[in-house]
Amino acid sequence: MGGNKQRWFSFHQRSSSATTTTLPQHKHDETPPEFLCPITGFLMSDPVVVSSGQTFERLSVQVCRNLGYIPDLLDGTRPDLSTVIPNLAMKSTIFSWCDRQKVDHPRPPDAAYVEGVVRARMDKDPNPSPGQSPGPGDKDPEPEILPPVEENSPSDYDAVMEAIRARSKNSMSPTTSLESVTIGQSSYHPVRAVSMFSSSTTSSSSGVFAGADSPFRNAMSFSSTDHSSSPMSPEEEEIFNKLRGTDIFDHEQGLILLRKMTRSSEDLRVSLCTDRILSFLRSLLVSRYNLVQTNAAASVVNLSLEKQNKVKIVRSGFVPLLIDVLKSGTTEAQEHVAGALFSLALEDENKMVIGVLGAVEPLLHALRSSESERARQDAALALYHLSLIPSNRTRLVRAGAVPTLLSMVRSGDSTSRILLVLCNLAACPDGKGAMLDGNAVAILVGKLREVGGGDSEAARENCVAVLLTLCQGNLRFRGLASEAGAEEVLMEVEENGNERVKEKASKILLAMRGGGGGESEFGENAEAREWNRMLEATGLSRTQFQGGQNGGFAYSSQF
């Protein structure tokens, strides 16, 4: 791999003909290292995310799987190559970078060459692979990778959403068989889509999934295991027979039936989340028929309510499709998609993948601009859960989330939920710096001065929690807080608030006055302790929190 001296080359320059294409030469430090395949060191033409989170050239992963080799990366780790998901956001970014650099887009590498590179690495690898990664033709099921995660937090959602929060499911062994499905080419009258992005906005996935020979569908077959011969239940067979035809009316009826069956039955959600049904849902989710798209999106939400379905749905390639619908689908479909991304983001295993595939920015746009209140509320909850991991916090900050969220707090729009996202962002250095630069202290102090509103108590407590996170280990906070008149407001909160708020306000005042509270009181670990304490006070934890406080937060659709 060459350590830090990686370079990328265009494979199409290796031609036996007299005509060759010459590209401008670049220094290795001009190519962002994340654009290079860790195995070959070349610019990726078809990047994919593997199960362990790294991004590789698809062909590199395929060759490693075929040879039963798991490479040792520069950081000393060995990736899990058992499943791949197309990284369309990375592909779009690489192509945009090539356009700016005025060079051709990278072409797929030569298979024989990549195999030679991998075999050379195998010969030089001092340690054998810890185990053989299953090849595309293997029939053995993938190992279980999901530990049980409790989801027993209180909720004020409807019966559908309450079901997921009341259940604690066992681990799952995800499989991701993808079958090619072609929708009949009958005439139609497309409905007007409600676009949430301007024409100048770069899309990471739009337009990729329109046809049956979509690159996405063909690419995903690499990680599939064929289960088409497995027996069908009577319910699945009834739905399957309607979805497999070419008549749009049959598609609508099949999706309505699937949506109805999975609305309240936990057992049917599990039994109907099969590779066959998911394959049809992928195709129908991008339909230009209003009812087809809406019912497909609602069906995805219903299936995602069961914990053991969450990773399977993400691994089956739904996230890029959901993002497309969130950007340009109908209003009702956007509501369901926001709810689906929220539901899928509850699973820790999905958080990184959803962020990598480009969901953060569309969710932020939906939170700010969607015509649907339900979509905005579920987008906020999805962002909260995604921002529980550091990489997504960084993505949110880079997407300009801080000024957007602070503006919404100032205007009083979805304040309590947005404050939860801000508290997560304040826990990372970039987020804390952006918030302090964005006048967050004065805005939050001003919010504390306000009285009234249905969720004012929750917003009040969350404001204090964000201020506590901002004050920890930051020398700028004291001056900004004094300038905003925070001491007087916090003293009033300390006097009149509940016990949790009083404790937090006291610690902020102590930090402002420069007394006590050294690193042990306001260090890095203290931030996590205080934030967890705030959520646990209502019977929740950071991983369990579903957004329901004081009975005023439920906006998810009836699915």
Swiss-Prot record:
Annotated spans, Disordered: 1-30, 121-156
GO biological process, alphabetically ordered: protein ubiquitination
Its biological purpose: Functions as an E3 ubiquitin ligase.
Catalytic EC class: transferase
Entry-linked SMART domains: ARM, Ubox
Substrates-to-products reaction catalysed: S-ubiquitinyl-[E2 ubiquitin-conjugating enzyme]-L-cysteine + [acceptor protein]-L-lysine = [E2 ubiquitin-conjugating enzyme]-L-cysteine + N(6)-ubiquitinyl-[acceptor protein]-L-lysine
Gene that specifies this protein: PUB41
Record has Repeat as a keyword: yes
ARM repeat intervals: 266-305, 307-346, 348-388, 390-427, 428-472
Single GO MF annotation: ubiquitin-protein transferase activity
Protein name stated in the entry: U-box domain-containing protein 41
PANTHER family (UniProt xref): U BOX DOMAIN-CONTAINING, U-BOX DOMAIN-CONTAINING PROTEIN 41
Listed pathway(s): Protein modification; protein ubiquitination
Alphabetically ordered keywords of this record: Repeat, Transferase, Ubl conjugation pathway
